[in-house]
């Protein structure tokens, strides 16, 4: 049995990339909400932190899309 099959119940590596993409996009969206909360509270340090985290999630999402696109050709 392949390692990914034991971990996720499927041998499809595309599922794993799609899952990372989903969670990255969800994280970026959630950080957007937290960013708005911090800005409304006037906490610029926290707002900057959420901007950075959101940017990281977006980078992960972009990388996931690239990897998935390459594998679906």
Pin down the residues of each PLM region.
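Amphipathic alpha-helical hairpins
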Residues: 2-73
């Amino acid at each position: 049995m392949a390692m990914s099959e034991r971990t996720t119940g499927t041998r499809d590596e595309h599922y794993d990339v799609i899952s990372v993409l989903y969670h990255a996009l969800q994280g970026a969206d959630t950080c957007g909400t937290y960013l708005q909360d911090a800005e409304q509270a006037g906490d610029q340090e926290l707002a900057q932190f959420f901007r950075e985290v959101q940017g990281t999630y977006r980078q992960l999402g972009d990388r996931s899309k690239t990897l998935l696109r390459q594998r679906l050709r």
